[in-house]
């Protein structure tokens, strides 16, 4: 049976597609062994074991951005990680390395080269990260979420691998039950605000200032502030604050409109099930979130606003009227669904299994 090593992690944007592909591979090949490579500090340390997979860990290795002491220490630390992963490959008889970006992916790509283990890469964002740019050079196959992502001639659009809870979600059928489980009223317009697994300080700061104005119209808010953020609940009626949600499918099903960052994972989940959204791209980094959102905005399924412009006045002028306009929300929902995909995990699993089938035979694992 096949032994898979899935490498990635750090945030939900890396962990969720990894778990979606793991679940798809396990469903197709129940006797296979699926190992996950990550770090102790990342979200994977909690989510991977909870999903029933074995987590192997290496030290967290951020790529250095400046020629300083961290850059000097990086090379030997990276070499140690590569050696550690090579031993894992030999001892566990790993047949393929599947990388999703993040701290664990780059050394896994490097480690797979010498023993001739095929590498398959999935890139979530429209603008690829450094680890996956390196991995794509040696990969047998590359899956991308967005058309036009520059990862070489082997890149194939597969969409975002989504957890089954999202990929099979029927919002209309479960909306009332989702609202009940989340402690929300069944019949009120519902705004979901989320900044991702670590939260978004600027979104939190703005929304808390206008929460009372929004709920005064009869609407309700579910605000996921993020586990890494300090936040004081103001105690406004119908303003529900939670730190983090492991059941985002419930939150998405409950929502009429979402305010969100434009990370590839969140965007792909919302478009897959046709949820209208206001996207506020993260203003730091390589700008990938602003690129991610172009397709859904062009289709009419979302609105984009710069982080600096996402002010209380902007929310009252744009979000509040939209939340009370069911016809506009219905049009946006249909447009969002037109650019979403639900079968990314299956298509990515096809790439992985094809790479395994094409690999040359290798010696058995050491026992």
From Swiss-Prot:
Name of this chain's protein: UDP-N-acetylglucosamine--N-acetylmuramyl-(pentapeptide) pyrophosphoryl-undecaprenol N-acetylglucosamine transferase
Function: Cell wall formation. Catalyzes the transfer of a GlcNAc subunit on undecaprenyl-pyrophosphoryl-MurNAc-pentapeptide (lipid intermediate I) to form undecaprenyl-pyrophosphoryl-MurNAc-(pentapeptide)GlcNAc (lipid intermediate II).
Biological processes, Gene Ontology terms: carbohydrate metabolic process; cell division; cell wall organization; lipid glycosylation; peptidoglycan biosynthetic process; regulation of cell shape
Domain of life of the native organism: Bacteria
UniProt GO cellular component terms: plasma membrane
Location(s), subcellular: Cell membrane
Name of a matching Pfam family: Glyco_tran_28_C
Main location: membrane
Key words of the record: Cell cycle, Cell division, Cell membrane, Cell shape, Cell wall biogenesis/degradation, Glycosyltransferase, Membrane, Peptidoglycan synthesis, Transferase
EC number from the UniProt entry: 2.4.1.227
Listed Gene3D superfamilies: Glycogen Phosphorylase B
Annotated pathway: Cell wall biogenesis; peptidoglycan biosynthesis
Binding locations of UDP-N-acetyl-alpha-D-glucosamine: 11-13, 125, 163, 197, 289
UniProt family annotation: Belongs to the glycosyltransferase 28 family. MurG subfamily.
Reactions the enzyme catalyzes: di-trans,octa-cis-undecaprenyl diphospho-N-acetyl-alpha-D-muramoyl-L-alanyl-D-glutamyl-meso-2,6-diaminopimeloyl-D-alanyl-D-alanine + UDP-N-acetyl-alpha-D-glucosamine = di-trans,octa-cis-undecaprenyl diphospho-[N-acetyl-alpha-D-glucosaminyl-(1->4)]-N-acetyl-alpha-D-muramoyl-L-alanyl-D-glutamyl-meso-2,6-diaminopimeloyl-D-alanyl-D-alanine + UDP + H(+)
Membrane topology type: Peripheral membrane protein
């Amino acid at each position: 049976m096949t032994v898979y090593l899935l490498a990635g992690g750090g945030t939900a944007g890396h962990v969720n597609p990894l778990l979606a592909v793991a679940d798809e591979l396990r469903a197709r090949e129940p006797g296979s062994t699926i190992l996950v490579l990550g770090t102790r500090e990342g979200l994977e340390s909690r989510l991977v074991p909870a999903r029933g997979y074995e987590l192997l860990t290496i030290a967290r290795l951020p790529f250095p951005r400046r020629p300083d002491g961290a850059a000097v220490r990086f090379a030997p630390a990276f070499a140690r990680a590569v050696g550690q992963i090579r031993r894992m490959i030999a001892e566990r008889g790993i047949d393929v390395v599947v990388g999703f970006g993040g701290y664990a992916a780059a050394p896994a790509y490097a480690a797979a080269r010498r023993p001739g283990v095929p590498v398959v890469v999935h890139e979530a964002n429209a603008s690829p990260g450094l680890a996956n740019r390196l991995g794509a050079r040696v990969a047998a196959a590359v899956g991308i979420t967005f058309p036009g992502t520059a990862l070489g001639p082997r890149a194939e659009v597969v969409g975002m691998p989504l957890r089954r809870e999202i990929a099979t979600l029927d919002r209309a059928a479960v909306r009332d039950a989702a609202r009940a489980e989340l402690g929300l009223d069944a019949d009120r317009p519902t705004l979901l605000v989320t900044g991702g697994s670590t939260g978004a300080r600027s979104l939190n700061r703005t929304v808390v200032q206008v929460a009372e104005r929004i709920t005064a119209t009869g609407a309700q808010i579910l605000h996921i502030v993020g586990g890494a953020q300090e936040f004081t609940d103001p105690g406004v009626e119908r303003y529900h604050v939670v730190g983090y949600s492991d059941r985002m499918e419930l939150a998405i099903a409950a929502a009429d409109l979402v305010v969100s960052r434009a990370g590839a994972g969140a965007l792909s989940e919302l478009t897959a099930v046709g949820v209208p959204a206001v996207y506020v791209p993260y203003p730091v980094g390589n700008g990938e979130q602003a690129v991610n959102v172009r397709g859904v905005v062009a289709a009419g399924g979302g609105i984009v606003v710069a982080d600096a412009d996402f002010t209380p006045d902007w929310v009252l002028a744009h979000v509040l009227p939209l939340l009370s306009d069911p016809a506009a929300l219905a049009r946006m929902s249909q447009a969002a669904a037109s650019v979403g995909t639900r079968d990314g995990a299956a298509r990515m699993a096809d790439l992985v299994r094809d790479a395994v089938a094409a690999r040359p035979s290798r010696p058995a694992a050491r026992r």
